[in-house]
A protein has these predicted regions:
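Membrane-interface starts of transmembrane alpha-helices
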Residues: 82-93, 117-121
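Start-transfer (signal-anchor) and selected internal transmembrane alpha helices
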Residues: 1-24, 114-120
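Transmembrane-helix motifs of polytopic, lipid-linked glycan transferases
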Residues: 92-117
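Extracytosolic (periplasmic/ER-lumenal) interhelical loops and adjacent juxtamembrane/interface segments
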Residues: 44-49
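Membrane-embedded alpha-helical segments of multi-pass membrane proteins
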Residues: 67-74, 92-100, 142-147
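Helix-to-loop transition at the C-terminal end of transmembrane segments
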Residues: 22-41, 134-136
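Membrane-proximal lumenal/periplasmic loop motifs of glycosylation machinery
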Residues: 30-38, 52-77, 87-88
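Membrane-interface micro-motifs in multi-pass membrane enzymes
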Residues: 36, 69, 116-147
């Protein structure tokens, strides 16, 4: 007996993607001002220093754990030029980095020949805060997006 493929309507996969995006947006908004993590906060401190000195690289910064030259500060630094509120910078920076993550995955999925339906289903999973470590490391702190 042959198994039939289950076809999910495109509207359902797009709806799933939108729902996951909204969940990530809500989580990012609720936690943007409450992340007390030295590594994540040091990225914002560096970005603020770069914004205040109008530089992309700084000679006055000593990295605590690793050398991060082209990283999240390239997103956060221009946001400090717009907003003075650190919570807003973290919120919009995380959203921009999540958008970059999804757009880069969209490019990969199209190059791999995936349908848009598959992209919406799997791209939604990228934005889904399925566990605390994934939500903190990837979605909120955006550690692996620039890599």
């Amino acid at each position: 007996m042959m198994r039939q493929k289950v076809r999910i309507p495109s509207i359902l996969s797009a709806l799933f993607f939108a729902l996951c995006g909204l969940m990530s947006l809500y989580l990012t908004y609720k936690t943007a001002g409450n992340l007390l993590d030295s590594d994540a906060s040091s990225e914002l401190v560096l970005a603020r220093l770069l914004a205040d000195t109008n530089q992309i690289l700084s000679r006055d910064w000593f990295y605590s754990t690793e050398l991060r030259v082209l990283n999240t500060q390239l997103i956060y630094m221009p946001l400090f030029k717009i907003f003075s509120d650190w919570k807003l910078v973290r919120f919009f920076g995380a959203l921009l980095l999540q958008a970059i993550l999804v757009l880069s995955y969209y490019f990969l999925s199209r190059q791999a020949g995936f349908s848009r339906n598959v992209f919406f289903l799997t791209g939604g999973l990228l934005l889904l805060p399925a566990s605390t470590p994934y939500a903190r490391i990837v979605l909120l702190h955006s550690y692996y997006v620039p890599h």
